[in-house]
A protein has these predicted regions:
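N-terminal pro-sequences and low-complexity stem/linker regions of secreted or lumenal proteins
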Residues: 1-175
Length: 175
């Protein structure tokens, strides 16, 4: 596995916050080389075209291509197309799946409000000790997170409607 990113991932690569990666970075270990080094996206494009990608690669887009305000969906679609083109033109396309995933926990990508229980439901509302300024919040399923898969095995026009979360994608990769 390898994480491909530029230095400007604006805090979106959460591996930086795990102790084992902090220690690995200090010692320039194999873990740091794979998870938190900044080899740049040009290296990913080259490896994709030459069929030299590891079994799992993940990309953290730079801030200006993240679609976070003030940037636009057009900015994010540019890098998504560039990644897809590199992989689809590569020697390993016939055995590859690309998962595009968003990190939107604020619901900005969705037009449907997250379901939550009535305020009177006991045990379903808590005050987060770390975010007390937000007041009492519901617990349970959160906002829907958009993601899609591009692969020679997928068929267009289908929508996956089962409950899933970011860890669902990791579990899929581990199979």
């Amino acid at each position: 596995w390898l994480g491909d990113q530029d230095e400007d991932h604006f805090g979106d690569d959460l591996l930086d916050h795990f102790e084992q990666y902090e220690k690995a970075a200090k010692h320039k270990s194999e873990l740091a080389k794979r998870g938190t080094s900044y080899v740049g996206l040009d290296k990913f494009y080259e490896d994709a075209r030459n069929g030299n990608l590891p079994e799992v690669s993940y990309i953290v887009a730079p801030e200006n291509l993240s679609e976070h305000p003030p940037f636009k969906p057009m900015d994010g679609s540019w890098i998504q197309k560039k990644v897809a083109d590199a992989v689809m033109e590569g020697k390993a396309w016939d055995s590859t799946a690309i998962i595009y995933s968003y990190d939107e926990t604020g619901g900005w990508a969705d037009h449907v409000m997250a379901p939550h229980p009535p305020r009177s439901e006991k045990g379903e509302w808590i005050e987060d000790p770390f975010l007390k300024f937000k007041g009492v919040q519901p617990i349970g399923p959160g906002y829907r997170l958009p993601f899609y898969i591009v692969s020679p095995w997928t068929r267009g026009g289908n929508v996956f409607t089962e409950h899933a979360a970011h860890e669902s994608q990791i579990m899929f990769l581990e199979r």
